[in-house]
Every structure is written in C-alpha cells, then in structure tokens.
C-alpha cells in the first residue's frame, strides 16, 4: 500500500510534523526521583508548581479514547459476552474462528498476519461475517479499545475497495484528527500489500483546492472538514461511497455540531452504501443518534460487565488534615506487602504535593494528571504496567480503563465527590475497581476527614458493602489485614 497521502508540499510538511508527533511515544519519561523542591517535573522536562491547579481534572472523552488506543496496541482478553441482534432474526447467524474462513484476498490475509493477529477476537468473530457479507449489511456495534474493532472495519473498507477505480469509495469519520490518524495507521499496516490502494486525510491543515480530482480510494477525516470537502469544495462525490464508517460515536455526539455534520453527510449517501457505526458506550443519547444515522442495522452489544466489590476489602481512615493522611498512608505502606498501588486525588494540587512527599521518602512514583498530553499519559501508564514505578498517583483521568494485574491496593487520598459535596458513586466504583481484577483480591483505603464520614456512609449504603474503620496508628491492626 502506498504511504498515507496528503495534498501538495503543505501536506508533506504536515505529514512530517505528525510523524514527529507520534514518534514521541517511544521517548523515555524523565526521571522523577530525587526531586527536592515543591515542584514536579513533567515527562517533557517542564516544571509544575504545586501552588497551582486547585481545579479537578475534567475527563475528556476524546482524549480518553485516544489514550485507550495507545495503551491497547494489542488485543486484550475481554470478559464481556457478545450479544447479537439481527435485523432479520430468521436468517442464520454466522461466526468465524479463523480469518481463512472469511475467504479474503491473499494480500489482505498477509496484512492481517503481519499485524500480529492470529485469530479473530470475540467481537471480530461475530462482526466480520456481517461486515463482509454480500449484499452488504449495516451494523451498529459496541466495542472497547483493544478488542480489534478498528481492524475489523478497516478490513471491511479494504475488502470493498476496487483498486482500479481512482476515486473515493470508503469514508470513515472520527471525532478528532488524532483518532483519524490512529485509524490511518491501521489502514497502512493492514493494507501494506494492497499496493494500489491509497488513503487520504480530510482533517484540519490538509487544504485541498476546490475542484481537485481526488484519486485516493479511502478518506478518513473529521466531520467538519469532510462536510466542507463534500459540499463546499466538491472534492468527494458521496454518491460513489460504498462503505461509510462512523467511529467513536459516543465521543462524536459529545462534540458540538459533529452529530449534525455526520447526519448531513449520511443523508447524501446512496441507499446501497454499507454503513457501520461503533461506540464504546450505548447510553440513550448514543442509541438515538445511531438509530437516526444507520438504517436497518444488525446490532452487536457487549453485555454489561458488572464491576464487583465482592473481592475488594474496603477500609477508611479518619484523618485531621493532608499530612495526617500521608502519615497514615506511610504506615499502611510500611506494614503490608504491596505489588503496585494507584492513589487517587481529587485535584492536581494534592496529586503533585503527594508525589513530591513520596519521592522525597524514596518511593518509586509516577504522576498522571490532565495537563499531560495523551502521549505522555500513555508512556507513564506503560512504565507503570512494566513495573518501573510501583505507585501511580493520579486524578480522575485514570479512573477507568487502566487494567494492571499487579495492582493490589487502591487509595482514595481524596473521596470522589460531585459538586455540592454529593458522593460520586460511579467514580468511586471505577476507582477501586482498578484492584481486585482478573479474579484476584484487592484492598481499598479511603483517607477521609470527619466531615466526610456521612458521604462515605452513603457510598457504603449505595453499594451495600462493608467499609471498615482502620486505625492507621495501630501497626498490629494493619498487619492483620488479610487479602
């Protein structure tokens, strides 16, 4: 497959800049150890002063989506059960266990194996027969990062392309240009043996003059730019599109204007165009959007994985102030055998202060918070997974999706609360759910002040689980903790 293509010299410069952007992923993180000041050094060497950042980190759906793509570079084992709803319940339901069963072109099969795929993932087993069917079938699918979702729809696009026809035939919408580039990388890898198939980006910075004859068969872009290319610049003839993919639908509808742009594009597509929509979550708003944009679909859902607290022992420690919390943490840390730990703080200020304290006491610690770029976060998480640091201190940017088998302890240095001091039950669940995974037992400690006790009791009642008080000054009591 030809390299990913841009328009003209400006496009080449943009491509070079983006190659540099992604090469940062392999750069090692600067060492945090030995810091003796009230500042924390970022991954890029810049300094954050702990007198700043009282605000809580706001979870950015698009950034989280990109982060999950970067940290799930290979397939992950999913505990979800796949549920299929066919548009025609009487038709046979096919699944595959090998890629050979799909009767793919030889160059596509070679591309799949070159990417390291040995057999289809759970969602690929069910989705690929539908996506590659003749005549084409529309699909709405729920899928998390690491399940092979992007590879599945890229395979569908590459399978439908006629390399001899030099015009756009497949169109993929992504909510951000970074996510579009990630999809493009998969196209390039899987299509490396499809020498006459090319891809082009409809994203900001790639300016194409009106009336340009685009000969690339696959277009990947963001809704606003694609809309301009189709209706304003007349670069893409939507009546010739054979496959339309809308990726990250839950992120798309969270971005103002994108859902309207996507619907306008979809309405100009021919009735025989295959339409595929993917989303990590299927809340009501996503469902309503999906039903508006994908006609007569098959549906693949992941039966909801219930995070359980049954194998997590929960404790709380009453503290008077921040330093008291830190002393309690040190006592626990010195009395219990810990694999790896994640400590959650509500604000960047507390996260940075705690990082400095632990580093000065000789602990191997990394700090993860919202001011870091997505690539920097991915690098820190990978180092933590590799065991290069034993403690990860973070804000809510790490409350979901980070699965590390060695994590045995989660600490809420600050209790998660919503505005108005109401307990944030969902965040609490996902925070302490970082331990006790993969069938193992785990521990969760909540460092609270007296006025937070009513909120903690609400959490206990909400989950109908036991949260026991722990005297962190009684080392014998701590040592008796069994998990």
Swiss-Prot record:
InterPro entries xrefs: DEAD/DEAH_box_helicase_dom (IPR011545), Helicase_ATP-bd (IPR014001), Helicase_C-like (IPR001650), P-loop_NTPase (IPR027417), RNA_helicase_DEAD_Q_motif (IPR014014)
Binding site for ATP: 143-150
DEAD box (motif): residue ranges: 247-250
Cited PROSITE patterns: HELICASE_ATP_BIND_1 (PS51192), HELICASE_CTER (PS51194), Q_MOTIF (PS51195)
Positions in coiled-coil regions: none
Motif mapping: Q motif: 97-125
Domain of life: Eukaryota
Description of what induces expression: Up-regulated at transcriptional level by chorionic gonadotropin via cyclic AMP-induced androgen formation in the Leydig cell.
Pfam families, alphabetized: DEAD, Helicase_C
Cellular compartment(s): Cytoplasm; Nucleus
One cellular component term from this protein's GO annotations in UniProt: chromatoid body
Nuclear localization signal, short sequence motif: residues: 100-114
Main location, first listed in the record: cytoplasm
Residues annotated as domain Helicase C-terminal: 311-478
Post-translational modification: Phosphorylated on threonine residues. The phosphorylated form is found in the cytoplasm but not in the nucleus.
Tagged with keyword ATP-binding: yes
Residue ranges of domain Helicase ATP-binding in the record: 130-300
Residue ranges of the motif Nuclear export signal: 61-74
GO BP annotation list: mRNA export from nucleus; poly(A)+ mRNA export from nucleus; regulation of translation; spermatid development
GO molecular function, one term: RNA helicase activity
Record keyword Hydrolase present: yes
Family stated for the protein in its record: Belongs to the DEAD box helicase family.
Function: ATP-dependent RNA helicase. Required for mRNA export and translation regulation during spermatid development.
Protein name according to UniProt: ATP-dependent RNA helicase DDX25
Native species: Homo sapiens (Human)
Lineage: Eukaryota, Metazoa, Chordata, Craniata, Vertebrata
Gene: DDX25
């Amino acid at each position: 497959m030809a390299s990913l293509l841009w328009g003209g010299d400006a496009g080449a410069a943009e491509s070079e800049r983006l190659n540099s952007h992604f090469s940062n992923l392999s750069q090692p993180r600067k060492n945090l150890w030995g810091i003796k000041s009230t500042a924390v050094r970022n991954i890029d060497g810049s300094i954050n002063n702990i007198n700043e950042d009282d605000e809580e980190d706001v979870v950015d759906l698009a950034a989280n989506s990109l982060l999950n793509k970067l940290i799930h570079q290979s397939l992950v084992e999913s505990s979800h059960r796949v549920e299929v709803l066919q548009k025609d319940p009487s038709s046979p339901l096919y699944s595959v266990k090998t890629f050979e069963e799909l009767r793919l072109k030889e160059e596509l099969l070679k591309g799949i194996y070159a990417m390291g795929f040995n057999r289809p993932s759970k969602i690929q087993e069910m989705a690929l027969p539908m996506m590659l069917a003749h005549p084409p079938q529309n699909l709405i699918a729920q899928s998390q990062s690491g399940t092979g979702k992007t590879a599945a729809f890229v395979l569908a696009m590459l399978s439908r392309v006629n390399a001899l026809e030099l015009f756009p035939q497949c169109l993929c919408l992504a909510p951000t240009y970074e996510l579009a580039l990630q999809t493009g990388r998969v196209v390039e890898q899987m299509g490396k043996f499809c020498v006459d198939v090319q891809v082009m980006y409809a994203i900001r910075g790639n300016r194409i003059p009106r009336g340009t004859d685009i000969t690339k068969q696959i277009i990947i872009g963001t809704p606003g730019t694609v809309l301009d290319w189709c209706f304003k610049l007349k670069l893409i003839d939507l009546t010739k599109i054979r496959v339309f993919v809308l990726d990250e639908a839950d992120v798309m509808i969270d971005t103002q204007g994108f859902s309207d742009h996507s619907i306008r594009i979809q309405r100009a597509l021919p009735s025989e165009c295959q339409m595929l929509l993917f989303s990590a979550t299927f809340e009501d708003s996503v469902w309503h959007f999906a039903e508006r944009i994908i006609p007569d679909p098959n549906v693949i859902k992941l039966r909801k994985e219930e995070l359980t607290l049954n194998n997590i022992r929960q404790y709380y420690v009453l503290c008077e102030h921040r330093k008291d919390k830190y002393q309690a943490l040190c006592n626990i840390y010195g009395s219990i055998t810990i694999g790896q730990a994640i400590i959650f703080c509500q604000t960047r200020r507390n996260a940075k202060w705690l990082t400095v304290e632990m580093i000065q006491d000789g602990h191997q610690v990394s700090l993860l918070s919202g001011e870091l770029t997505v690539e920097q976060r991915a690098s820190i998480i990978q180092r933590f997974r590799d065991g290069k640091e034993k403690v990860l201190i973070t804000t809510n940017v790490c409350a979901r999706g980070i699965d590390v088998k060695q994590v045995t302890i989660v600490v809420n240095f600050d209790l998660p609360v919503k505005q108005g001091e109401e307990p944030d039950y969902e965040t609490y669940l996902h925070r302490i759910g970082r331990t006790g995974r993969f069938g193992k037992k785990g521990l969760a400690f909540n460092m609270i002040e007296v006025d937070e006790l009513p909120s903690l009791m609400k959490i206990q009642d909400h989950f109908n689980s036991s949260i026991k008080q722990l005297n962190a000054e009684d080392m014998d009591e701590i040592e008796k903790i069994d998990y």
